[in-house]
């Protein structure tokens, strides 16, 4: 990011004294972007007032505004951009009435953010990292050669400060643009699922997969170059250790290392966060599908509502009477002592003891899979183990098996977004939907 020697109070006072302010409506921003694009197409980078009026006329038409006062409104818009330092106006006695306009650094920066920064791609990142690698390579060779302070400032400090650091800042800014892009994609997915989730599934899958692929491709590019860049920076750092007169170079190296670490770290964190969001969306879609697998009820209900006036119908609801209302409040407790021994089938067995027995048995069973590096087919394991327990214990046993298996590892197919098939695990209609666990922790 931008480095400055000024403190926060100094910058605040400076801004207040000069009364800096930015106020760009949608129309004014569109006008500025149109000027920037037009300016890029010109070789000299200079524009006449007539050019700006023509551009404003196009903006006015796009916003469906009246053309009666086009000249006055264009003049006001140009003056506003000049006043807010988006444009510089040049005029002299030789060009009276023919002012020349050029975009200011502020105007270029804002328009660049909205136009060129969104063209972030793996190819652009590769080119940037290649330039950085060449600059750092030359700087490290110059550092190992050694020389006076002028040599260090010209051949080491200058390339790192004005080339490498600026490219790192550009990559950092591009990552922040991608963060904003992810938020817009999330909003688009939420809107699709809110309107019609059945029709939106394909679109959501495409958006999720495309974003995941872009993030991984860019992060792979960063990881491939990151270690080499850090090694070159360490070479330069070794050359300046212990030399107090080169403290400015050492400080710059430290800042560059921190920037590079931050870029790579946030890239990986962004992938992890997106994977979590991807799973959340898939879980929502899967739950919605499971609630009405064949969509028979939803389609029939939608059809009935649509044709209600042609074929009226009644909706009957039933609510079971609560058991508490059926209790006889006058019953008295029986306090007679029960003597003798209970049959073994009726003896009490605590849930904690049962849980410990099942956990110990399942740990022994599942660890054997990990030692042999064999995938765990949960549906098959559940079916084999539930056969040894009564039906009343099936739920607790299945929950313990799944909990122990998930602790051992995960299924790579979960990351692909593919849905596993439902498979029966007992003879009473219980089914499970799970991929094979094939990657152990």
Curated annotation (Swiss-Prot):
Gene3D superfamilies this protein is in? Chromosome partition protein MukF, middle domain, MukF, C-terminal domain, Winged helix-like DNA-binding domain superfamily/Winged helix DNA-binding domain
Q: Might you report a single GO cellular component term?
A: nucleoid
Q: What does the entry give for GO biological process?
A: cell division; chromosome condensation; chromosome segregation; DNA replication
Q: Which Pfam families match?
A: KicB, MukF_C, MukF_M
List keywords of the entry alphabetically. Answer: Calcium, Cell cycle, Cell division, Chromosome partition, Cytoplasm, DNA condensation
Spans annotated as Leucine-zipper: 208-236
Q: Which GO terms describe its molecular function?
A: calcium ion binding
InterPro entries recorded: Chromosome_partition_MukF, MukF_C, MukF_C_sf, MukF_M, MukF_M_sp, MukF_WHTH, WH-like_DNA-bd_sf, WH_DNA-bd_sf
The superkingdom of the source organism is: Bacteria
Q: Where in the cell is it found?
A: Cytoplasm, Nucleoid
Q: List the disulfide bonds.
A: none
What is the annotated role of this protein in its UniProt record?
A: Involved in chromosome condensation, segregation and cell cycle progression. May participate in facilitating chromosome segregation by condensation DNA from both sides of a centrally located replisome during cell division. Not required for mini-F plasmid partitioning. Probably acts via its interaction with MukB and MukE. Overexpression results in anucleate cells. It has a calcium binding activity.
The UniProt family comment states:
Belongs to the MukF family.
- Quaternary structure per UniProt? Interacts, and probably forms a ternary complex, with MukE and MukB via its C-terminal region. The complex formation is stimulated by calcium or magnesium. It is required for an interaction between MukE and MukB.
Q: What is this protein called?
A: Chromosome partition protein MukF
Source organism per entry reads: Pasteurella multocida (strain Pm70)
Phylogenetic placement of the source organism: Bacteria, Pseudomonadati, Pseudomonadota, Gammaproteobacteria, Pasteurellales
Instruction: Give me the gene this protein comes from.
Output: mukF
